[in-house]
Design a protein with these regions (language model features):
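A generic local structural motif
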Residues: 3-4, 47-50, 74-79, 138-140, ...
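Core catalytic region of metal-dependent phosphoesterases/phosphodiesterases
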Residues: 17-19, 24-138
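Residue-level detector of transmembrane insertion/anchoring sites
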Residues: 11, 49-50, 56, 145, ...
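Conserved beta-sheet core of the metallophosphoesterase superfamily
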Residues: 108-222
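A general structural motif
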Residues: 13, 58, 85-87, 148, ...
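Acidic, histidine-bearing metal-coordination/catalytic regions of metal-dependent phosphoesterases
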Residues: 1-38, 193-224
């Protein structure tokens, strides 16, 4: 299966934002206290308020994994309902249990499977994307073209990625902004951790574009 990049346009009528690792409902102090909150409820409320302050209902919010932890399906649906944005695209992270129930109940049974091994109808590749309500599941990896610019998105940062030799960007999360090579001020790649711990809000395409202009195009492989 050959999958074309997803094309999006950022303009005054429709803006594109990116974030990762919100960890809604995470009940461990090392998450919410590090972000300046007393408990998970205060943490949830603050993150929802900030998202709604930045992202409009008509915009697109692309979330690169680890949306939430330790949450029941009703709690998950409540948080999702409180986020005003009506178009949230989701990349799988490594903490998927909270969103897995929603996915299995509403999505998995409707996905097409490309079978290439084994005898089970579930042996194969899930064909993305699939949308249910305001959530679109994009799988573990996706290539985007936003305003004509190539962006590779996934949860985990990678040193080498498609089209990097032509100036493509990579957006990721996972490290909670502890990896210096994926931070704003690191000059020697066009890779950025868009996670909440680094920015405290979703980043817009123009904000990311400004950051990437200050990063060097470094060729890491032989595709020069």
């Amino acid at each position: 299966m050959f999958e074309r990049p997803l094309k999006l346009t950022h303009n005054d009528n429709h803006r594109v934002y990116f974030t990762s690792d919100t960890h809604f409902n995470h009940d461990k102090p090392f998450i919410y206290e590090a972000r300046g909150y007393k408990n998970r409820v205060e943490h949830n409320d603050a993150l929802i308020a900030k998202i709604n302050e930045v992202v409009r209902p008509e915009d697109t919010l692309i979330h690169l994994g680890d949306f939430c932890l330790n949450i029941t399906p009703p709690e998950f649906n409540e948080i999702l309902a409180r986020i005003n944005c009506q178009n949230i695209a989701y990349i799988w992270g490594n903490h998927n249990s909270c969103i897995r129930k929603h996915y299995e109940d509403a999505v998995a049974g409707h996905l097409n499977m490309v079978r290439f091994t084994g005898n089970s109808p579930n042996d194969g590749i899930e064909v993305y994307p699939y949308a249910i309500g305001k959530l679109t599941y994009l799988g573990y990896y996706k290539e985007l073209i936003v305003n004509g610019h190539m962006i590779v998105i996934h949860h985990y940062p990678h040193q080498i990625f498609n089209q990097m030799q032509k100036g493509a960007w990579q957006l990721s999360g996972h490290s909670h902004y502890t990896n210096p090579t994926t931070q704003v001020d690191y000059p020697d790649n066009k890779i950025l951790d868009v996670g909440w711990d680094g920015h405290g809000k979703p980043l817009s395409f123009p904000e990311i574009q400004k950051i990437m202009l200050n990063k060097n195009h470094v060729k890491q492989d032989k595709h020069h």
